[in-house]
Amino acid sequence: FGQGAILCHPWVMKEMKAAQDPDRTAALESFDEALAGHVRYGISNAFRSFWFAITGSKFGSAPGDDYTRPFFRKLDRYAANLALMSDVSMLLLGGKLKFKESLSGRLGDVLSHLYMAGAVLKRHHDEGAPEADKPLLAWSMYNSFHQIETALSAALRNFPIRPVGWALWALVFPLGRRAEAPGDRLNHRVASLLMSPNEARDRLGNGVFLTPCENNPGGRIDSYLA
């Protein structure tokens, strides 16, 4: 995660390249521009993290329809949280970040669930936002949000520099953690969809080899639930 955080950062690579530029005049100009952008980026992420937390991610522009827009806003909040924590971790730990495997692993978990939740939302809209798929979409979102907050919470509670961890907690979770795992009622709705033939299950298995033959247990289970 540490190497990826540097390579994917919108400003760090520009700062590093400017520092290595043999032309001192051009280097100072480029570095000042990148540093100013980096500072603005950090302040923006800190403000967005706090604002989304205290407002419950209910405000701000977001794509999607009335059903999915709150999910997109939640992803925007967690993306700001990840960017803020990554920036602070790189600033204070530097090259030691890649040796802090628990911290980098938890931040990597946040990134993974952001990708997965974003992919689920994109597929939902690409397929025309079918009504029958909403329980599957909701379960995926609530599960990812819960996993993201669990990883963020663990990273903050165990941050190597404790006062910094407390300060970050005040920005990321000023009102405490709110995301809960999918409840039993939603679990039952999803289970019912998966255990009976329907269009939602057909879409979920689209492109998957489901022929019920000897060496394909997935196909055999699908035939049992037909």
Map each language-model feature to its residues.
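Flavin-dependent oxidoreductase catalytic core characteristic
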Residues: F1-A226
